[in-house]
From Swiss-Prot:
Residues reported to bind NADP(+): A195, G196, A197, A198, N288, N320
Keyword entries, A-Z: Metal-binding, Multifunctional enzyme, NADP, Oxidoreductase
Source organism per UniProt: Salmonella typhimurium (strain LT2 / SGSC1412 / ATCC 700720)
Gene behind the chain: maeB
Gene3D superfamilies referenced in this protein's UniProt entry, alphabetically: 3.40.50.10950, Isocitrate/Isopropylmalate dehydrogenase-like (3.40.50.10750), Malic enzyme, N-terminal domain (3.40.50.10380), NAD(P)-binding Rossmann-like Domain (3.40.50.720)
Name of the protein: NADP-dependent malic enzyme
Pfam family, one: Malic_M
Amino acid sequence: MDEQLKQSALDFHEFPVPGKIQVSPTKPLATQRDLALAYSPGVAAPCLEIEKDPLAAYKYTARGNLVAVISNGTAVLGLGNIGALAGKPVMEGKGVLFKKFAGIDVFDIEVDELDPDKFINVVAALEPTFGGINLEDIKAPECFYIEQKLRERMNIPVFHDDQHGTAIISTAAILNGLRVVEKNISDVRMVVSGAGAAAIACMNLLVALGMQKHNIVVCDSKGVIYKGREPNMAETKAAYAVDDSGKRTLDEVIDGADIFLGCSGPKVLTQEMVKKMARAPMILALANPEPEILPPLAKEVRPDAIICTGRSDYPNQVNNVLCFPFIFRGALDVGATAINEEMKLAAVRAIAELAHAEQSEVVASAYGDQDLSFGPEYIIPKPFDPRLIVKIAPAVAKAAMDSGVATRPIADFDAYIDKLTEFVYKTNLFMKPIFSQARKDPKRVVLPEGEEARVLHATQELITLGLAKPILIGRPSVIEMRIQKLGLQIKAGVDFEIVNNESDPRFKEYWSEYYQIMKRRGITQEQAQRAMIGNHTAIGAIMVQRGEADAMICGTIGDYHEHFSVVKAVFGYRDGVHTAGAMNALLLPSGNTFIADTYVNEDPTPEQLAEIAVMAAETVRRFGIEPKVALLSHSNFGSSNSLSASKMRETLERVRERAPDLMIDGEMHGDAALVESIRNDRMPDSPLKGAANILVMPNMEAARISYNLLRVSSSEGVTVGPVLMGVSKPVHVLTPIASVRRIVNMVALAVVEAQTTPL
């Protein structure tokens, strides 16, 4: 490790506070009553319930989402036996990964005990605390004995990740690699370098999936493991000892091998050995940080080889984070008493299948220009693929149920998958009523920036989720090329329609219609013709206006107001409305907050604000939320007579005329809007109850400042929008920072609006 990296790592662990984890309360402790409920005397109630029924611990405590990462520090990474305390940073790091990828809480426990039986007693005594045990960095062969005995004694999952995590990912890689090279697992020969925990676990899984034991040759530090090589050979090694053929070295047995599995050390495999392997060999060189052979060296002599390593700087990284958080997620969610072979195999298959799926936009963004289509350079998913939890956890949970180790079976797997999706997309629960309605009658939605990678990823999502019938504007050759490069599985003419912006035969009709709309706005016929080639938003707008599309989502490129000016000119306002407005939703840990008008009107009049407030309430109801509107100002219920304050008071009067049943009040300060007790101190009889969820600002400046401050102040907050209100057709203008998920969300909203919009 170079000095710069070393110092950066030390600083990372020291500042701003030492370590990487902390305990945060999940219940409020703001009042004396809170304290009485959390501790004495109230805490006695759940204690007595658990005494009557031990399973009640999962209902009243955090046990069901709590895993112990336990180590004695005898085999820490590549550092060896450095002791329990020195291994603590690794155990904390494991805890961070559990939390980050699967929402699982972790206590890291470092046990200063080398005697296996004493270590077992310590861990077994902790069973009442945890929902699962993750054994970490314990040397072989003791790790096999420790895990076996703990599995026998404990009634919660016990999982030695160094064995089974590596085995699960490696096995998934081998299954997919064999599929690429069209070989059968029952026919291939495999040579293994290393006979430690990971290697043995890999072989066990592969045999369970059909690999023949007689086709496996294992080499350890003494050479080939064969029957009779030594007395009292460890059982784990003896299980894979072959008949004595006279061959003693890796170099001798590698000839003709289809697979090399390396769980040993650096530079064990040479180029000369690789040359002797079978057609299209698979090489899993998993030693870290330096593998058994570097991929460029192997490729130099065997360009047909498929290579996996444990490193992130080469394709096909075998990384345990691909599985352990999600295996535990599935096991915990059904109250599994063990992680058995059926659950491991379910994880293998789920991981292997995910590599065949279309690429996630998160992965594409994280890995830049890499080709992430299934093939020799991509046979296992990337660690940052957000879909891992949605694919692996349900598969593991179902396997636990089917194999009889689940104590709390899942009754509704669709609801369970929806819940898991919240780990991937924080907007999932918020958007659920919109998605459900959109699926009932998907509409044609035109996406003018059809060549954009985000739009293409969104199109894939829309098709997968069954939310819409996308129409993309762009050059067909460019769209097809980018779909292939992004590893997507959508097909033009099957999943979506393309409107070629350079040569669509309808363009004469389009520009003629556009000219009729714009001719009194300074647009000539020639300019209208050019708009049909260069202004994709204009093309999409005319398609919606002609009934060739039902809705439009634009704005992922360019300036908001340029897009909006086209939308406003083509569509105008809906009946009974004389203005438009934009609203953004902020999904914060404290609740959902909607802010208007964030984009359209710089200094709206009371009449405009009243229309915006009423339209905002209508939109919020679509999400299944009761609107509670606060009109914000520097003035608090008449404390100022400034023009701004007077404007908001007049707005309130106009809203009450338009929507007398709407829960609304103002003008008020922001804290009064969000905290009922503060509001009641000033206005005890306010009709607004609880925290306001729609904040109507006096002008765009205040709205935009508030929105951006709230957006960046919460690391857990996510946004939806901007939602365009008041236009006669279901159209929304996004901004260039819109994510793929935001595009998907807004398309779904536009579909729901189109379902109720007259043609």
